[in-house]
Amino acid sequence: MSTAPGLLRQELSCPLCLQLFDAPVTAECGHSFCRACLIRVAGEPADDGTVACPCCQASTRPQALSTNLQLARLVEGLAQVPQGHCEEHLDPLSIYCEQDRTLVCGVCASLGSHRGHRLLPAAEAHARLKTQLPQQKAQLQEACMRKEKSVAVLEHQLVEVEETVRQFRGAVGEQLGKMRMFLAALESSLDREAERVRGEAGVALRRELSSLNSYLEQLRQMEKVLEEVADKPQTEFLMKFCLVTSRLQKILSESPPPARLDIQLPVISDDFKFQVWKKMFRALMPELEELTFDPSSAHPSLVVSASGRRVECSEQKAPPAGEDTCQFDKTVAVVAKQLLSQGEHYWEVEVGDKPRWALGVMAADASRRGRLHAVPSQGLWLLGLRDGKILEAHVEAKEPRALRTPERPPARIGLYLSFADGVLTFYDASNTDALTPLFSFHERLPGPVYPMFDVCWHDKGKNSQPLLLVGPDSEQA
């Protein structure tokens, strides 16, 4: 069977320059190129001396490739055929086969393998196909724009990696600052992890950049080829048009996928700190907040001490609440004077053997009038004790959620609030050397909050014990 006219020339043409091979080399993946074209398009080799194959992105070493002598001899033989003539019949290529998208001679068209195909005179085919160039050029330009945007995104992600690691190191330094000497080993470990992530992310992103830049070079090269082909004479245009179109569609179909960046670093959060607390007890806990009760917010039955750190429910009949909406009129509660709006905070409340209480935070704009529905949607995040033994979390439900009953109810409650992490955690702080987690709300607070203290009704003296704020100086009264 004879070879179809033009097919041999197509097979012996470099996919990068679209010319007959010049010093052809065959990569390890099987694709062949002019040696100079491969070196030019592949760019600088990686550390291991390899470059990506422009056709399939497989790794190859261009300097180690020897000239493909078999291809070179075929090219040399084909070069003897006059330009624009049939390789089989040596007649002028004057007819265009639409079915096979190639130029053929009159013999191929009437008697050869293209007999019965859809055929056009070369001049008519030239005029018709040339009108398709603007659309193909537009596709190429659009592909260039998309990949240029991808390059910009990757470069921005490289900056984000640096910024993420910088913020992470700052958080590590802030959390471990007070105990830096003791925790040097931990900080070193975290720093190495950050360096590893930055290194791996950087290598991955630079690899993607290299691949995209190589792909962009192919697109730009094709754009130049299109411009050159557009100005070629009829015969040469038709000979190269199919090669250009085929190569263009192949390049567009081999667009590298967008990079996905997944930075995984330990989160400096409540969980992270609790693991450290188990070894360091309270060493890394934020300093105790110097909170004081706000008498103007207290229910009329509550008595706040002069120091502002003690509050109890009086058994004497209290006057009705005033019209000040900042004051609780039904719930026997009080808030702190201090408004919390950012950062992290830790405070402790001595509850002693008080059988009923509730503690937590209250949204600054939450209502304090009437019977309160203590759930997060109403701006209340509370943990309480009922009947001297049942711990309850006031979650979003009709009834509070009963927690695991401790062997002994906590005598002191620690509350940790982190706005950045969206965490409010309650601890049993009865043991001065350890913190035992009781419950956590995991949600970002919608705005500033006040520490809230529901003293609860005195219950005819059964629940008259006070709540005491534990201060940095350990004075509670």
Curated annotation (Swiss-Prot):
The keyword Cytoplasm does not apply. Disulfide bond formation at Cys-242 occurs in case of membrane damage that cause the entry of the oxidized milieu of the extracellular space, resulting in homooligomerization. The keyword Chloroplast does not apply. Zn(2+) 4 binds at C97, D100, H114, H117. Zn(2+) 1 binds at C14, C17, C34, C37. Zn(2+) 2 binds at C29, H31, C53, C56. It catalyses: S-ubiquitinyl-[E2 ubiquitin-conjugating enzyme]-L-cysteine + [acceptor protein]-L-lysine = [E2 ubiquitin-conjugating enzyme]-L-cysteine + N(6)-ubiquitinyl-[acceptor protein]-L-lysine. Muscle-specific E3 ubiquitin-protein ligase that plays a central role in cell membrane repair by nucleating the assembly of the repair machinery at injury sites. Its ubiquitination activity is mediated by E2 ubiquitin-conjugating enzymes UBE2D1, UBE2D2 and UBE2D3. Acts as a sensor of oxidation: upon membrane damage, entry of extracellular oxidative environment results in disulfide bond formation and homooligomerization at the injury site. This oligomerization acts as a nucleation site for recruitment of TRIM72-containing vesicles to the injury site, leading to membrane patch formation. PANTHER family: E3 UBIQUITIN-PROTEIN LIGASE TRIM (PTHR24103). Belongs to the TRIM/RBCC family. This is Tripartite motif-containing protein 72. It comes from Rattus norvegicus (Rat).
